[in-house]
């Protein structure tokens, strides 16, 4: 019963984090459009008209508002999931559609946080684990930049560099905490393992990005891969699994894209690879205990 109530609380936290992440996505996009406009690049005038209000005020005075009519949202308009459902996905004032991104993100983050809590619960038969709670909280916070990157790359095929490095820092802290709780702590073997893992995934993608001039792999993908490796168990086999699963998920994305657009998959098709890498990491993260047992059995 205690785990159930806590999972609901963390699920609600996930919905809040999801709502915050989507808000940052629109702010980052508005800033990008402003920078491109200032540098003389051609931008989408309709999109800029919709988002420019997000960069026209100082961060201190920035308040959540409708991007269509400017209505400043009240606290009861900002309750994740519930507000969207009660308003039918529309602005309270002008009734323009808010869009499904906000709702889907909040629901997905609610479900994800519940699952992650159940997998990494700091509560066990042995009692409460402060280490487990610390690791869990860092992981939850790391999901904010991950969510931002997932949405941003899916919409505009671009990974914001600053957000990547924020995530990488959080992932590194998560890795440090994980090792601080192990019996052996830091040793040459653990350093060797992480070095091999970095060679198997991030370094391979770095080389591919440089050789292809970022045609095969984006410049942000290999940087993101560094942080994703830190989230997984410190075994090179997980880097190999992540490399395989990321490409497999990317292929699935390409198939769905071709089906939705009624087009055949062509050689050289470009798909946002960040979401594929993130989704692959989540799958490995959730099933890591099973995979650890399985790999120890076959190796």
Where are these regions (language model features)?
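A membrane-topology feature that recognizes alpha-helical transmembrane segments
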Residues: 1-299
